[in-house]
Amino acid sequence: MFENVVGLIVEYNPFHNGHLHHIQEIDRLFEDNIKIAVMSGDYVQRGEPSLINKLEKTKIALSQGIDIVIELPTFYSTQSAEIFAKGSVNLLNKLSCSHIVFGSESNDLDKLKRIATISLTKEFELSLREFLAEGFSYPTAFSKVLFDEKLGSNDILALEYLRAIKTINSKIEAYCIKREKTGYYDDEKDNFSSATYIRKILLDSNEKKENKLNKIKNLVPEFSYKILEENFGVFSCLSDFYDLIKYNIIKNCSELKNIQDLEIGLENRLYKYSLENLKFEDFFNEVLTKRITISRLQRILLHSLFNLTENITEKVKNEVPFVKILGFSTKGQKYLNYLKKSKNYNERKILTSNRNLKEILNEEEAKLFNFNELCSQIYRIKSSYINIGYPIIKKD
């Protein structure tokens, strides 16, 4: 009945023309498809709060052709590429996706599959850890193990998706499409500009509102522009959370050593410089070292705020505790109803509301669900948005 159930792993921070191209390419590749997006919620993989909240992002995604939006919980969305990818692929697997389509700079799937297979060997893993221990970033370390094979940021994520598919023995079939013109950090000013460039415009404190909106108008679809315009003035960035981060570091200094991804000794720098700096930028630059990338430090700061520990990461690393549906279209609803008839439906842990949690989740899974809800509540402290509830339903 549903042959082409296609998964996307996205952040939509914010949704731009390149994302629309991704969706259109899926429609070109697969007729009569169901598109399921695993989407970072209120926090993204670079270790930052999402520019706009997850419910607004869900509205945009549904308006542009996505059929089901699944939240990628914070304990996956703010992690390294490996954990981010594995959690995402596991979620798509829970909803029986037949395919996954991702962007790639190289657009060479055979090459990426070969590298993914090699990268799962013990020899590769040992070499990778050696380079990481020397202070190289994950993408650079990965490249060095491959004798300086040049890989773009999207190629690295693509490799992690392929590795995850192999690791969990998923039947999902991978497709890649050419990443249109821009890389993760590109400042290209054509109609396929990157999310990084668009955020840079919107968060520029030296520009007037009208100028910012004019600059992005041709870079995002019309409905995305409308939502961004409505949310103008309440865009979230990490510096907004500095007082909360600082409070938590000072209050829980002795517990910081248990925080996910924290290097030994870094807890002392966090404590020392949080006491000495009133401004986030000064604090951040003092803590930053050559051994830590900007994104990694941002992730560590969020983990300290949430108290996201190594113990929590170990619990969710190999098995997703729940599947939270943020929204769906009429077609998406039909697919969800179809899944309800499957024999293993209860094992999928699908949540379409906060009701009946005790009937669906066990005690440990419920704790992890509540942890993710707490992270969103912290986001709402600074973003001034009201939780209107989920799922968001788009009638076709």
Curated annotation (Swiss-Prot):
Keyword presence, Lipoprotein: no
Keywords: ATP-binding, Cytoplasm, Ligase, Nucleotide-binding, RNA-binding, tRNA processing, tRNA-binding
Domain of life, source organism: Bacteria
Entry keyword annotation includes tRNA-binding: yes
GO biological process, one term: tRNA modification
Family assignment from sequence similarity: Belongs to the TmcAL family.
UniProt protein name: tRNA(Met) cytidine acetate ligase
